[in-house]
Each structure stands twice: as structure tokens, then as C-alpha cells.
């Protein structure tokens, strides 16, 4: 065993000398030149990437160290929370509590609003004392009431315009499509004249004339006889008057 171990130890310097020899170094360099990584320039690219990564890491570290936010580490979250709390407090202070009015207060306010939509300071103060409110609350109520009044007016005007447009459109359609009037009923006289023939009308007219002619002849004869009688009487009266010689 000792002899074999000694033989191995003796061979190690020989191997080291063989690797360090110039011929062996040239062989290793030739193998390295023909390797895949050397042919594809992967070794140089890897070295460049590694160097660039080291530079980026160094710059990032310096920027983080130089930033003012990280210098005060645990102070920034606390400051942000304080700012948020202060803003919320301001909003709560600015927000007013909603006032609820009872029926008597609303009646008094509505009566004044019916008289004037813009009461002056004296009227508002007097009204506030009567309804047990502050003058500012009364002023805000009148502002809201005026806005509501304007909204109602606009809605009523819009409804009125819509109804007018609807009626106008209905009139236009009626003019465009007129209804045919029904024929008026004809009188009975017109129907009798229309149905009777002209010959029948002439016959009736001649019959009436024939019926009236005898009466007219008798009247004329009577008048002639009367004239004759009057003439005879006149002649007789003249003959009876004595003549003076």
C-alpha cells in the first residue's frame, strides 16, 4: 500500500510539469479557441453583460441612497397619515349638519316666501327669532327654496311646450288628411221635384189654370154688367133734369 501511494505521489509532479510545459499550454489554447462559446463570442458577451449589470446595480444603489425619501425611512408613512387625517378633519369641519324643520317652521317660511323670494336681513332676522332658528339657516333655506321654485318653473314650461307641440302636430296631420264630409240630406220638395217628370208638372199647372179660368170669367162679366147699369142710370138722370129756356 505504501509503495503504491508513493508511486502516485511521484507521478503528480510529473503531471504538473507536463501541464505547465509550453506544448501543453498551446494545446489547451487551441482547444479553447475551437470551443462553442469562443466561436459564438459568448464569453465576451457574457463578460459585457455582467459588467453592465454591475454598473446598473451600482447606480441604482447610489440613487436609492441619495433619495431624500429613504433618508427619513420610517418618517414618511407617518407624515402621509398625518396629512390625510388633517384633510379629513378639514372636510368634516366644512361639512354642515343638515337641519330638519318642523311643520310650524315650514309654514312660517313658506308664508314669507309667498310674499317675497328675496327677504332682506331684517326680515330674515325677525323670521329666525319667530321660528327659533339662526339667520344663516333661514338664508340657506330661502336659497334652496328659490332653486326649487326655478326647477318647478322650468318643468312646467317644458310640459307646456310639449303639450303645445303635440296639439300643433295633431292640427297639421288633420290638415294634411281632411275628412270627407257626409252629403247633406236633401229636402222632400227637392226630392219630389227631382222624381216628378216635367210633363206631369205641366199637366198639374194646366189643370190649376183650367180650374181658375171660370171664376175669373164670371168676375169680369159682373164688372161689365155693373158698368152698363151705372151708365144707364146716369143717362136717365140727365134726361129727367128740366131744361131752362
Curated annotation (Swiss-Prot):
Pfam families, A to Z: Homeodomain (PF00046), OAR (PF03826)
Motif range (OAR): 222-235
Keyword tRNA processing: no
One example of a Gene Ontology biological process annotation: roof of mouth development
Role noted for this protein: Master transcription factor of stromal fibroblasts for myofibroblastic lineage progression. Orchestrates the functional drift of fibroblasts into myofibroblastic phenotype via TGF-beta signaling by remodeling a super-enhancer landscape. Through this function, plays an essential role in wound healing process. Acts as a transcriptional regulator of muscle creatine kinase (MCK) and so has a role in the establishment of diverse mesodermal muscle types. The protein binds to an A/T-rich element in the muscle creatine enhancer.
Subcellular location: Nucleus
Residues passing through the membrane, by range: none
Subunit text: Interacts with SMAD3.
Phosphoserine carried by residues: 21, 197
Keyword Amino-acid biosynthesis attached: no
PROSITE patterns found in the cross-reference section: HOMEOBOX_1, HOMEOBOX_2, OAR
Protein name, UniProt field: Paired mesoderm homeobox protein 1
UniProt-annotated stretches for the region Disordered: 1-22, 63-103
DNA-binding region listed in the record: 94-153
Post-translational modification N6-acetyllysine, affected residues: 160
Family to which this protein belongs: Belongs to the paired homeobox family.
Organism, scientific name: Homo sapiens (Human)
Compositional bias annotation for Polar residues: 69-84
Source superkingdom: Eukaryota
